[in-house]
């Protein structure tokens, strides 16, 4: 038995098969949508997943203004940020955040960012996420595939062919 023939394949920037996918966020719960999008960005459904490399897909989220929260989280959930100055802790609810310019994009990017690694790779992966409030996006040249995020399961993530 030749054990030298068993090589572990690690994906890198050149060998990663990155695709463009479109996810419709209409009537999706924010946390569940963010979790599945983070897995798509990370590439965890791919057989050549490598933890230290960007081998995930580029994800376009459309209809970000139609997401929903369960319960009364629109008004009860609080997002905190700190300005860096004494007494500079600011809080904002999702309802207040959605009223701001590009609030839909900021909300979903913040949710997905919390589910990615807290290092340089996580920042790079977040750059592969594009969020749009309406149904139009500017990435038609990349010919993205439209996927149903509900059909993407936790145990076996698959993309339609």
Segments (PLM) and residue ranges:
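Positively charged, low-complexity, intrinsically disordered RNA-binding extensions
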Residues: 107-151
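Histidine (H) residue identity feature
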Residues: 17, 52, 137-139, 156
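Ribosome large-subunit tunnel/peptidyl-transferase-proximal elements
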Residues: 2-84, 89-106, 144-151
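Conserved small/polar residues in nucleotide/adenosyl-binding loops
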Residues: 155-161
């Amino acid at each position: 038995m030749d054990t030298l023939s068993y090589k572990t394949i690690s994906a890198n920037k050149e060998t990663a098969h990155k695709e463009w996918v479109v996810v419709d966020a209409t009537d999706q719960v924010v946390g569940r949508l963010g979790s599945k999008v983070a897995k798509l960005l990370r590439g965890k459904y791919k057989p050549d997943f490598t933890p230290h490399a960007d081998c995930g897909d580029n994800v376009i989220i459309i209809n970000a203004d139609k997401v929903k929260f369960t319960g009364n989280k629109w008004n009860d959930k609080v997002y905190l940020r700190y300005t860096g100055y004494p007494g500079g802790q600011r809080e904002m609810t999702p309802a207040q955040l959605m009223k701001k310019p590009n609030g839909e994009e900021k909300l979903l990017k913040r949710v997905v960012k919390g589910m990615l690694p807290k290092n340089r790779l996580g920042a790079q992966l977040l750059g592969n996420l594009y969020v749009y409030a309406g149904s139009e996006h500017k990435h038609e040249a990349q010919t993205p595939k439209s996927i149903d995020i509900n059909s993407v399961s936790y145990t076996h993530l698959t993309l339609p062919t």
